[in-house]
Amino acid sequence: MLEYQNIFTRVQVHGPADMGVPMKHTNFGREGTPVFNRWMGKIGDAQIGPIYLGFLGIASLAFGFMAIEIIGLNMLASVNWSPLEFMRRFFWLTLDPPTAEYGLTLAPLKKGGWWQIAGFCLTASILLWWIRTYRRARALGMGTHVTYAFGAAIWLYLVLGFFRPLAMGNFSEAVPFGIFSHLEWTNNFSVNYGNLFYNPFHMISIAFLYGSALLFAMHAATILAVSRYGGEREIEQIVDRGTASERAALFWRWTMGFNATMESIHRWAWWFAVLCPIAGGIGILLTGTAVDNWYEWGIKHGLTNGNPYDMTVPSTLP
């Protein structure tokens, strides 16, 4: 007897290409001839295309391309236009925001101006794509849950690169474009403002981050575990609970004492995921504007007694 395992997609059934629901009045059509890719089918739908971009999609990609082009060319210029050095030092290359002396004004190109232009293009690209998700959802008769979830991530992005620098009075507070440079910015941000771990909104954000990962793993594992009973057909299980849903519910009642429903688990996951960047954005926005030192704030409000841990290693160990 074959063992039933479905951690990876092992069976792929290819029917006729799905061209999507009929489109109403539009100046743009779906582009591309559908093709099937076996390796894409390992993780998702094997069909690639056709795709609909429309005006908003094309404009978003254009602004995104300009942002990446500006960032990339500035990084390439910083290594004297050497492709080999660009690849070797790629993780260390950066495009920094203007220094504090320029405040909120437009800085010279080589002193932060390129960062401002790239930031504008990237923000325009993201916002245009966000509007596109709303319009595509409406056109397909869907709810706008994805749009609002995407908006939560955009909120955090705008806090880091625009809202907080605006409140602080200069763009030097913003995050640079670069892999290691933005990690260094994160470390310095926490150090300069007294350890971000004492920020209650950071605590809430991390709780929702870990909670999202836990819920995602629990839900995915549960559905895979009952897919032999048709558990992956969740819409059917929501409106007409079958043996897959009953077995999953019984498992969690036995192991946790409580079970979500086939519908409510998605609400749990949506709220946990959305509240992570929302809480994080609030915490970042309060840092430096309302609270200058989170460690001292934590002492004042009883989060810590202010006594540092003794990390001294004794000269003689027992």
Residues covered by each model-derived region:
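Membrane-interfacial helical/loop segments at transmembrane boundaries in membrane proteins
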Residues: 75-106, 165-196, 235-252, 293-318
